[in-house]
């Protein structure tokens, strides 16, 4: 059995080893393996229409994909870090993308968007929320996302739709560091 001298790693060295291991597991090896963001027409909660991914406003865009209202807490765990990233790099924008089945119907979709608009007092936040009414299976397939809707996904996407990085679940410093490294690599 191979024995590694990890007991000799202290403080910063141990963190660096852990960071490298986590980055290797969080970052995709290629955009093809990570998927391509599909062509979608959708509106934000300020009722501005977008043709995605080409009308994402950043050269690089962080999209937080959620499937259930109960996942908002997971989304919220990311927001302070995403605001810091956006403030520090003018080429990066972030969006919240609630993904809802297109079979929901026009009236229910209108009710859902209206409820979200009423529940979000900040105009800036409403502008960042773009509700996607899509074929969920086709959407997940295009992005190579698991079929499960038990967690959120955080993607770094360019305007051509290439997924450059992927993370999932609640915010962690290690996953955020991996995201920042992917942004730096793709500037």
Feature map (PLM): residue ranges:
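Boundary at the C-terminal end of the N-terminal hydrophobic targeting segment
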Residues: 31-34
């Amino acid at each position: 059995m191979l024995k590694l001298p990890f007991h000799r790693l202290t403080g910063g060295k141990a963190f660096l080893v852990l960071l490298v291991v986590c980055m290797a597991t969080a970052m995709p090896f290629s955009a093809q393996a990570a998927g391509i963001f599909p062509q979608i027409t959708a509106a934000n909660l300020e009722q501005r229409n977008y043709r995605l991914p080409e009308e994402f406003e950043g050269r690089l865009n962080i999209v937080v994909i959620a499937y259930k209202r109960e996942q908002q807490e997971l989304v919220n765990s990311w927001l302070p870090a995403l605001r810091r990233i956006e403030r520090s790099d003018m080429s990066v924008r972030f969006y919240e993308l609630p993904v809802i089945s297109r079979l929901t119907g026009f009236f229910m979709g209108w009710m859902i968007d209206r409820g979200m608009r009423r529940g979000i007092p900040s105009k800036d936040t409403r502008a960042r929320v773009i509700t996607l009414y899509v074929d969920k299976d086709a959407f997940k397939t295009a992005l190579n996302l698991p079929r499960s809707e038990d967690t959120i996904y955080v993607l770094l996407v360019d305007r051509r739709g290439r997924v450059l990085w992927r993370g999932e679940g609640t915010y962690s410093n290690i996953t955020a560091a991996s995201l920042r490294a992917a942004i730096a690599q793709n500037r």
